[in-house]
Amino acid sequence: MNRGFFNMLGRRPFPAPTAMWRPRRRRQAAPMPARNGLASQIQQLTTAVSALVIGQATRPQPPRPRPPPRQKKQAPKQPPKPKKPKTQEKKKKQPAKPKPGKRQRMALKLEADRLFDVKNEDGDVIGHALAMEGKVMKPLHVKGTIDHPVLSKLKFTKSSAYDMEFAQLPVNMRSEAFTYTSEHPEGFYNWHHGAVQYSGGRFTIPRGVGGRGDSGRPIMDNSGRVVAIVLGGADEGTRTALSVVTWNSKGKTIKTTPEGTEEWSAAPLVTAMCLLGNVSFPCDRPPTCYTREPSRALDILEENVNHEAYDTLLNAILRCGSSGRSKRSVIDDFTLTSPYLGTCSYCHHTVPCFSPVKIEQVWDEADDNTIRIQTSAQFGYDQSGAASANKYRYMSLKQDHTVKEGTMDDIKISTSGPCRRLSYKGYFLLAKCPPGDSVTVSIVSSNSATSCTLARKIKPKFVGREKYDLPPVHGKKIPCTVYDRLKETTAGYITMHRPRPHAYTSYLEESSGKVYAKPPSGKNITYECKCGDYKTGTVSTRTEITGCTAIKQCVAYKSDQTKWVFNSPDLIRHDDHTAQGKLHLPFKLIPSTCMVPVAHAPNVIHGFKHISLQLDTDHLTLLTTRRLGANPEPTTEWIVGKTVRNFTVDRDGLEYIWGNHEPVRVYAQESAPGDPHGWPHEIVQHYYHRHPVYTILAVASATVAMMIGVTVAVLCACKARRECLTPYALAPNAVIPTSLALLCCVRSANAETFTETMSYLWSNSQPFFWVQLCIPLAAFIVLMRCCSCCLPFLVVAGAYLAKVDAYEHATTVPNVPQIPYKALVERAGYAPLNLEITVMSSEVLPSTNQEYITCKFTTVVPSPKIKCCGSLECQPAAHADYTCKVFGGVYPFMWGGAQCFCDSENSQMSEAYVELSADCASDHAQAIKVHTAAMKVGLRIVYGNTTSFLDVYVNGVTPGTSKDLKVIAGPISASFTPFDHKVVIHRGLVYNYDFPEYGAMKPGAFGDIQATSLTSKDLIASTDIRLLKPSAKNVHVPYTQASSGFEMWKNNSGRPLQETAPFGCKIAVNPLRAVDCSYGNIPISIDIPNAAFIRTSDAPLVSTVKCEVSECTYSADFGGMATLQYVSDREGQCPVHSHSSTATLQESTVHVLEKGAVTVHFSTASPQANFIVSLCGKKTTCNAECKPPADHIVSTPHKNDQEFQAAISKTSWSWLFALFGGASSLLIIGLMIFACSMMLTSTRR
């Protein structure tokens, strides 16, 4: 479906949009023909109801509400079962809903007779279908039937690529259909739930607006035209990004799917069943609730703690079947829990103590210096456990140890300074804190003050490439992760349990050698004693325990099993409730955007093959560079203050990134001082800067050659003089011109003629005579044989070519994105056809296999098991890195006193294991193995006046098609991939890293905790947990453990491939790929349709053409200008092409007259650009003497490579030839001969 759903409809003009204030249905009701059957009744009913309910607000009459009796009279006119709609309508009008806004009213009015419900077999609405532009369209993932007697019987065409299906709309319904538009500038649009914002190429809505069941709804502009159809949504924090179908200006359908999108079709309701003992019940309708039977309700939750519908059961247990708002406002999941006292390491920054605000854990994974704190107190609840926004509750340290409450103003949080509290819920606080070495939570009231300090280093954090202490007011927004301040979000679960009852010494009294159980007023307590025999009992008044003489022989406690507490190691696990519950961990770590500073842009000074960056910043800013060739040579440096950095730039280019600025790519031009067409010293100066080594070698060679030539000439002259004068030295007074004597000594030599040679062979070797004579005859015979064999082939080929539908053209295109390759297709009998192939994009797509994911782990230390006067035994457990150990001779002591009546026969079973961190979903790394890579390119092909875009795999096999065009590309000349065999992906960044294999964990190293996915149950780990013997002062579980290998890897991961990849590759993920790598050449075979060619008789015929270059600057841009003067037989379009790789023309086709001139622009990298240009097939040569460019550095890559024959100017060659064989050489030789003659003709006696 290359044209989407509207191939035929895109060419007709859109009908004029209907005005919003004039209801279209009422205006057209009179002239419409009467419809027969059920469809007509439904249409009339829909029109009437819409006019009464919605159109009332738009009528041009006084805004009086319609009397209720008239609405009731209209209701019975609905099809059978009138009572059911009545009750439904009454139910809808009972809640006091806010009045719909203007955008909602408009959407509702337009959707009234154009949008249809899609229902499943049970009659539930699961999505929508809409009538638009002569078609009825429905999302493919909405599996149901359109609630319309006619539309439900239509045959739909499916398109899985766009997740849509469509059918032709009946003719009598087309006038009521929507129209669509491809124009959607940034701003706000309308849909069923209000406003939709379009920005950055995405449609977004506030979170919580819209959801399942909204698939298929339209998004409309203010004119009522559809700009998009909603398919689903992806939660992105405070807003939801919509997955939509839109259309471009050519009518082609475009599907936009944000990452993490969920389809918004309403799933069929499946009743989940939960268990209580052997009895099953629907999870959303438990047999009891917490307010009625707290203990039994907790039993139900604990038994179904691992059920997939646990959240549904938890909500049902809390709601108790009540629909009143007062109930929902005070009942919360933390109503099931209670605060507790825990052992704090530093109370008031000094000594350990039992604290009501013991800090259990601190998370600091957010990028905005926000921390999440878990304590033993509860925030947002009053003393009774009801939700109260301005209160908190805590376990009192006083003798009664009851739950107390206070105002949230008493809660203070600090690190190295005060923190700002952002949100709170249950055991958790969310605060933004300055850096520090510890975290302190304090309760400061007028009566008392208590605090707890946890040693935890809070490091200053920043995102981006510039360090800052405080986020700027103005700057740039980049992706980051923050804690969601909404209390309703969940980051996972925390484990809860009902602890063993705490024994309080205050419940026992010793008097006169007797022990008494002394319960608080109106409370029951249970005592256990070992006074010879084991004794136990439950009393409500002061009672003597017979046989006991000391308090240490007994323990007494209150039994309350109606509350959960956090599974803290400071509490004792209950023997009867080993099952655990779980509650949601609030304040999820979510992706967001953070404001970061942007350093002052560098002052860039361009030089010859180098740039200087003058940098000035008042905070640490990162500067990274890499070369865009085969050897990237990446550099990284943090800079502060004023400084200058110099970098060499070559033809391949250099990329530098300064702070949070966008990457900048620069390329060196072959600019140089001097003039390649000037005097010798200017030529030497020019080439010395461009090619210093070769220039030095050439000048040195020329100098040496001249010195050798002069030296040899002088020596030869001396020797000739000596040799010639020697014979006359014996003849006294001889005067003879020596030059004449030398000339006489030279013998003449002439080659024999053909006749003399043949006569000699006939006389001396007749066989060779005949062989010599047969050579021309043999050549003639071979030539005739070849012609006789080729003639039938040429005849058959010519007949076959006349029948084919396409002409195949093969060429090789450089794999350099955005650089066009141009060719001229010359076909016998047809006019030349210009062909331009541009690699718009390229992707190296490796096949990958995810080995595992890893992230920061959380150590879970459950409440220990205590056995008084006995021993325990460890049992195996299905947890990652599970460690268990039993310690004997312990003396458990808590804030209520001793918990056992034995001194040393007690035992404690300590356990510990690890889990994925609650923030692992937002901060984890993928360990991936990379295998064979495939390559895909996006091509832009222009032939004649036709432009086509297509994607094709570069494997030499798989064809790519676009309309009548067929292309086969590859294989590429050189295989390349920037990825090693093992890579790690973390937050969109890719690292080549040799990670450990799955199952080969090492404590403190990358991969110390591994899972195949974030939701899998196959978690394995090795963190070297070692349990230690607890001390007697309090109940606790001491242990040691290796630090997180994931955190250590993050701090030493090095630079990602995005900054170090060769060939200028851009690395992307989801899927893993390398984009726009400039390397290699791609062979391409293209079948050009016959319709693209023009017969020679129909094309202009250029008889003469002449090229004159008016201006030429060799550079990366089109710096040359040439004028082609021509004579043609007719007016028309002519292809113009450069047949030399020395120059590339900017134009592909020009308009010619019968006689005239056209100007073309060309790009060359050579100072002497001599290239052949053809106009309508007529060729001529352009000779250009190009000047060096003024700009040393440019931002565009070169379009041509320099060739040897064009690298040296014609003037340089002239000077070089003149040096060795021109007039100067002749002059030197003449002078030498003259000198020799003078010496030889001189007389000596």
Swiss-Prot record:
Residue positions bearing lipid (S-palmitoyl cysteine): 724, 744-745
Host transcription inhibition as annotated region, ranges: 37-70
Ranges of residues in domain Peptidase S3: 114-264
Effect of residue 398 to E: In strain: AR339
Database matches in Gene3D superfamilies: 1.10.287.2230, 2.60.40.350, Alphavirus E2 glycoprotein, A domain (2.60.40.3200), Alphavirus E2 glycoprotein, domain B (2.60.40.4310), Alphavirus E2 glycoprotein, domain C (2.60.40.2400), Tick-borne Encephalitis virus Glycoprotein, domain 1 (2.60.98.10), Trypsin-like serine proteases (2.40.10.10)
Ranges for region Binding to the viral RNA: 86-115
Residue segments, region Interaction with the capsid protein: 719-723
Effect of residue 141 to R: No loss of autocatalytic cleavage by capsid protein. No infectious virus is produced
Biased composition (Basic residues): 67-106
Region (Interaction with spike glycoprotein E2): 157-162, 249-253
Cytoplasmic face residues: 719-751, 785, 1240-1245
Effect after changing residue 724 to A: Loss of palmitoylation
Glycosylated position list: 278, 524, 646, 945, 1051
Alphabetically ordered keywords of this record: Capsid protein, Clathrin-mediated endocytosis of virus by host, Cleavage on pair of basic residues, Coiled coil, Disulfide bond, Fusion of virus membrane with host endosomal membrane, Fusion of virus membrane with host membrane, Glycoprotein, Host cell membrane, Host cytoplasm, Host endoplasmic reticulum, Host Golgi apparatus, Host membrane, Host nucleus, Host-virus interaction, Hydrolase, Ion channel, Ion transport, Lipoprotein, Membrane, Palmitate, Protease, RNA-binding, Serine protease, T=4 icosahedral capsid protein, Transmembrane, Transmembrane helix, Transport, Viral attachment to host cell, Viral attachment to host entry receptor, Viral envelope protein, Viral ion channel, Viral penetration into host cytoplasm, Virion, Virus endocytosis by host, Virus entry into host cell
Positions of the UniProt region annotated as Functions as an uncleaved signal peptide for the precursor of protein E3/E2: 265-279
Residue segments, region E1 fusion peptide loop: 890-907
UniProt-annotated stretches for the region Ribosome-binding: 100-114
Family membership: Belongs to the alphavirus structural polyprotein family.
Protein name (database record): Structural polyprotein
